[in-house]
Amino acid sequence: MSSLGASFVQIKFDDLQFFENCGGGSFGSVYRAKWISQDKEVAVKKLLKIEKEAEILSVLSHRNIIQFYGVILEPPNYGIVTEYASLGSLYDYINSNRSEEMDMDHIMTWATDVAKGMHYLHMEAPVKVIHRDLKSRNVVIAADGVLKICDFGASRFHNHTTHMSLVGTFPWMAPEVIQSLPVSETCDTYSYGVVLWEMLTREVPFKGLEGLQVAWLVVEKNERLTIPSSCPRSFAELLHQCWEADAKKRPSFKQIISILESMSNDTSLPDKCNSFLHNKAEWRCEIEATLERLKKLERDLSFKEQELKERERRLKMWEQKLTEQSNTPLLPSFEIGAWTEDDVYCWVQQLVRKGDSSAEMSVYASLFKENNITGKRLLLLEEEDLKDMGIVSKGHIIHFKSAIEKLTHDYINLFHFPPLIKDSGGEPEENEEKIVNLELVFGFHLKPGTGPQDCKWKMYMEMDGDEIAITYIKDVTFNTNLPDAEILKMTKPPFVMEKWIVGIAKSQTVECTVTYESDVRTPKSTKHVHSIQWSRTKPQDEVKAVQLAIQTLFTNSDGNPGSRSDSSADCQWLDTLRMRQIASNTSLQRSQSNPILGSPFFSHFDGQDSYAAAVRRPQVPIKYQQITPVNQSRSSSPTQYGLTKNFSSLHLNSRDSGFSSGNTDTSSERGRYSDRSRNKYGRGSISLNSSPRGRYSGKSQHSTPSRGRYPGKFYRVSQSALNPHQSPDFKRSPRDLHQPNTIPGMPLHPETDSRASEEDSKVSEGGWTKVEYRKKPHRPSPAKTNKERARGDHRGWRNF
């Protein structure tokens, strides 16, 4: 700031008396003020800091350049003090009623003032200055009517840089300035042409359009302001020269001053110019028509922008979908049971490549191949198997287990519902054609208006015929063959043009093309040329009948595709796979269940012939731990789980705590269960912990009867439903109280085995659990009331 204070006249902030706001320049607001010590009316532009504008103004001195007085350098008050133009800006003058007084001499004088001021900046100033923001708002009118150029906030010294940033206001900006390209002094020539157009037409350039819309029109569409047809030729030629797209073809301000002088010597020009200025109503419609056309282009641009955004959104979704798919290993085939060792090797290679950034898992693919892991064995691998193969990292094991579980889940889900892919080795296909009748109705909606020039119309296509016919139409295309209209393609009804078309040209026609789906053998498409004619009555529609020959395909087996249910997959392996999946799905729920139910739930499935038989047998809700004992005992039959849960909280010495529902079992049901119970001893069951190395177990798992202990009571519940080799039921005598509890998994004492054999004889057939109790030797108290006895009649009540 000290350097600035030394080079500029410094004006104290207290030496200024501020009045109203006169407007805003670039980078600051302008106020009318009084310089008290000099008794002079001035304009003060308040700034956040002093930059290039003060440096530029300090070296300029010209009649048509605003005069610079000094700067304010008192933080936080910074500003530039210049002369005050009492008549305001040229923009305000042009858009006020005062502009109606303008004539040829007025315009020529002011056009010359601006041209001389810009010529001084470019050629006569101590340093060449490119204004870059010349517009009617930055040209002010002094008290004597002389135009002065102000607001150099966007200006630059020419020898500093020619690559400019985006500044200024778009309607006045040259195309190269809008694009932030290197500029020369002729960019001010373009802006001068816009200011001259304002003085001639007294209109706002590109009125109603936003800045970015103007930028797109000027740069991309090469649009320019409309020069009315009745404008004097000399002015029109000068404007065209100033607005050349090639900056080198634009005239310099020295040439412009010369052109203005020659125009002043033309004696016929004043009459033409004054006639043009006074007949504004005749040519104003030309400017409005141009603005309407440009707005239509802008609307079309907005519509295309929305389409591009929607397309971009769909592409992002598709990209995300492809990314997700790329993270999933590609399967050699959907028949995982038929995978060879090489197929598994390929799958593991993809898996470790996706989930391994440090290349630590790259050796695992070879481990799978060395251990002869096929598709069947892959889906049955357990944690111990992976450790035996040499995979010791817990994280890597979890990664493999998760991938194998997902592969198993997808395979079982797709087993009966395979992907809809054509099998090259399948049954031969036979072709058959069917005929679908379709009537295409072509017409157009018409708003007559006053004639063919201002009427509005749009084409449509309707259908009639078989209801299924619409499904064979792929798309409908309307081509109006108009230069400013695009070809419209629609893929779903209603098939009608979206926008109205204004005016009907001579011999106007619309080409309508209906394209059919690939299964339509003939015709592939239908083309219709519809004539558009103006009429005050409703135009007649044209009907075109079409017969579609539809190609249908079906197999020799009555059109029923092959089923995966008769696949060559190993049924025993598939059943084991299903059981493993069920066990893994319910492991979390079993880990949260009541600790009294210590027996494995899925050991009950051992020895079943099929998955359906295993599911049919228990009929137990998965979330059995959430059912209360009382409700369950009233609503379900006394299966093993119901009894185990109910009697875990009941006193077994209650008089009426027996099973009244046990008598409801029919003899046929008991016989069926008895046969099934007897037959299953001879069957080999598939152990759930079978490994992929061929460990299909034919033995059943033996388990020790569990004992639950509650305060003051002991009971023993049969595990026959859980283990076929265990006695279905037994009772506990009082002398058992003195025997030690057994440890699960340890063999019983011989005396205990003999007792268990005696208890087997007391078991009823059918797999029902039978619980007996012994009453205490003492007789009931005579003080017990009938009301208390009645309370024991309800089965399942607790006695506390």
UniProtKB/Swiss-Prot annotation:
Q: Which residues carry this modification: Phosphothreonine?
A: T161, T586, T628, T664, T742
Q: Which residues form the Protein kinase domain?
A: 16-277
Q: Could you say which EC number(s) this protein's record lists?
A: 2.7.11.25
Give residue spans, biased composition: Basic and acidic residues: 667-678, 728-738, 750-763, 785-800
> Where, by tissue, is this protein expressed?
Ubiquitously expressed. Isoform ZAKbeta is the predominant form in all tissues examined, except for liver, in which isoform ZAKalpha is more highly expressed.
UniProt effect for mutating S657A? Abolished association with BTRC without affecting protein stability
Provide the residue positions that the database annotates as binding ATP.
Answer: C22, G23, G24, G25, S26, F27, G28, S29, V30, K45
Residue numbers spanned by region Disordered? 652-800
Q: Where is this region: C-terminal domain (CTD)?
A: 774-800
What are the start and end residues of every segment in region (Leucine-zipper)?
287-308
Partners and quaternary state? Homodimer. Interacts with ZNF33A. Component of a signaling complex containing at least AKAP13, PKN1, MAPK14, MAP3K20 and MAP2K3. Within this complex, AKAP13 interacts directly with PKN1, which in turn recruits MAPK14, MAP2K3 and MAP3K20. Interacts with EIF2AK4/GCN2; promoting EIF2AK4/GCN2 kinase activity.
Name under which the protein is recorded:
Mitogen-activated protein kinase kinase kinase 20
According to its UniProt entry, this protein's organism is Homo sapiens (Human)
